[in-house]
């Protein structure tokens, strides 16, 4: 939709990967719609995943005992976080939709993306106490997880060896994104591209493009336990 701004946080080492293709077709389709698309290519950026005292540029509030959450909160209020964090926060703040594109690692995100979440979505910027879940500071924004798996779709069902995929989305979609206020759209899951045929991979890409054509009309999922653990 013309005028909309999208941040695509991309976490894969190889541009020629299937994740790279998913990222590229998303950029192309959203740009065709008139959206302004910004990509944070975390590996290319050599993004620092570790949350350390180096994230604070000024004096610590307690130099004797370092507590990252408290120090990041105080530093955010004083605009004393490092420039890489502030830049990513600026991108998030400007975005109407944030898409995370990544391969599933151990039922979660790659370490570099986990580090992005740890460092960027800090207290004061993304949430406060009170000021989380439906009252989170990013409540006017949409978020979507688009990821690939190593296994087939059948493996991520209730009867499958990995269980229903919604189980492992609970901490990511609910405990992270919804906690910060995001309205979470249904995930885009590309099951087993490495074990799929070229034709099947083309279908996955086409399905993603087709979905993006009407992405602004989608309703968020109900971020309640019933979505993840019932049905």
From Swiss-Prot:
Q: Which InterPro entries match?
A: Flavodoxin_fold (IPR003680), Flavoprotein-like_sf (IPR029039), NAD(P)H_dehydrogenase_qn (IPR051545)
Entry's EC annotation: 1.10.5.1
User: What reaction does this enzyme carry out catalytically?
Assistant: 1-(beta-D-ribofuranosyl)-1,4-dihydronicotinamide + a quinone + H(+) = beta-nicotinamide D-riboside + a quinol
Question: What is the annotated localization of this protein?
Answer: Cytoplasm
Keyword field contains Cell membrane: no
Which residues take part in binding Zn(2+)?
174, 178, 223
Give the GO cellular component terms, alphabetically. Answer: cytosol
The Gene Ontology terms for molecular function here are: chloride ion binding; dihydronicotinamide riboside quinone reductase activity; electron transfer activity; FAD binding; melatonin binding; NAD(P)H dehydrogenase (quinone) activity; oxidoreductase activity; oxidoreductase activity, acting on other nitrogenous compounds as donors
Q: Which residues bind FAD?
A: 12, 18-21, 104-107, 148-151, 156, 194, 201
Q: Which UniProt keywords apply?
A: Cytoplasm, FAD, Flavoprotein, Metal-binding, Oxidoreductase, Phosphoprotein, Zinc
Q: How is the cofactor bound?
A: Binds 1 zinc ion per subunit.
Q: Which GO terms describe its biological process?
A: memory; positive regulation of ERK1 and ERK2 cascade; positive regulation of neuron apoptotic process; positive regulation of reactive oxygen species metabolic process; positive regulation of vascular associated smooth muscle cell proliferation; quinone catabolic process
Q: What are its cofactors?
A: Zn(2+); FAD
Q: Which residues carry this modification: Phosphoserine?
A: 197
Q: Other notes on this protein?
A: Uses dihydronicotinamide riboside (NRH) rather than NAD(P)H as an electron donor.
Family in the record: Belongs to the NAD(P)H dehydrogenase (quinone) family.
How does the annotation summarize its subunit structure? Answer: Homodimer.
What's this protein's function? The enzyme apparently serves as a quinone reductase in connection with conjugation reactions of hydroquinones involved in detoxification pathways as well as in biosynthetic processes such as the vitamin K-dependent gamma-carboxylation of glutamate residues in prothrombin synthesis.
This protein is called what?
A: Ribosyldihydronicotinamide dehydrogenase [quinone]
Native species: Rattus norvegicus (Rat)
Upper lineage ranks? Answer: Eukaryota, Metazoa, Chordata, Craniata, Vertebrata
